[in-house]
Regions:
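Catalytic glycan-binding domains that act on GlcNAc-containing polysaccharides
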Residues: 1-2, 8-11, 18, 23-197
Length: 197
């Protein structure tokens, strides 16, 4: 195929085999940025499927929406199995995963968060203890189900801690409950009383 012989496509495919996630994501963004037509986006969907790069599918979908090109398909919205007992949080778990890692199993952020649900090692260690699981740093990026199990349990803990408040639980998932509690003390609790516009 002519598309597969393009230098950027060759480089993206090579980075999947050998490169770290931060390198892969640069190529994926460049591919999506260079796509202009619905056909370009469909070729990206096919490439994402063939090389197993769910994050490329998500990035492609975001780019296609921004460009006003109607090339949205299942690669734009990957799905995964959630752990038993967390089925009611399926949408929230997928939203966090889509935002945090674009479904890239090997993602490691600049802050050190790891895997699909972008867990910080300390948070993962704490959550593994609460779930009676052994803590394994390499499994955060090497075992998607391990990462999802810990991340699902952690977001549920934050939901319980903040009385079912999605905004507070998601903020705590991302920035830590200590920071959210500081913000609440400094700015008031939006769950109490009216909001002063």
């Amino acid at each position: 195929k002519a598309y597969d012989s393009e230098p950027l496509v060759i480089a993206a495919k090579a980075s999947i085999r050998t490169g770290p996630w931060k390198e892969q994501i640069r190529f994926h963004r460049a591919l999506a940025y260079n796509a202009k037509t619905a056909k370009d986006y469909l070729l990206l969907s096919d490439l994402a499927t063939r090389i197993g790069a769910r994050d490329l599918g998500v990035i492609k979908g975001i780019s296609a929406l921004s460009a006003g090109v109607g090339a949205i398909d299942e690669t734009s919205f990957p799905t995964m199995n959630v752990p038993f007992g967390h089925e009611s949080s399926w949408t929230l778990i997928h939203a966090i995963t889509r935002q945090e890692s674009q479904f890239a199993e090997g993602a490691i952020s600049h802050a050190g968060a790891r895997g699909l649900m972008q867990l910080m090692p300390g948070t993962a260690r704490e959550q593994s203890g609460k779930a009676n699981l052994s803590y394994n740093l390499s499994s955060l990026t090497g075992d998607p189900q391990y990462n999802i199990q810990l991340g699902s349990g952690y977001i549920q803990r934050m939901m319980d801690y903040y009385g079912g408040s999605y905004p507070l639980a998601v903020a705590a998932y991302n920035a830590g409950p200590g920071n959210v509690n500081k913000w609440l003390r400094a700015n008031g609790d939006p769950r109490m009383g009216g909001i002063d516009w």
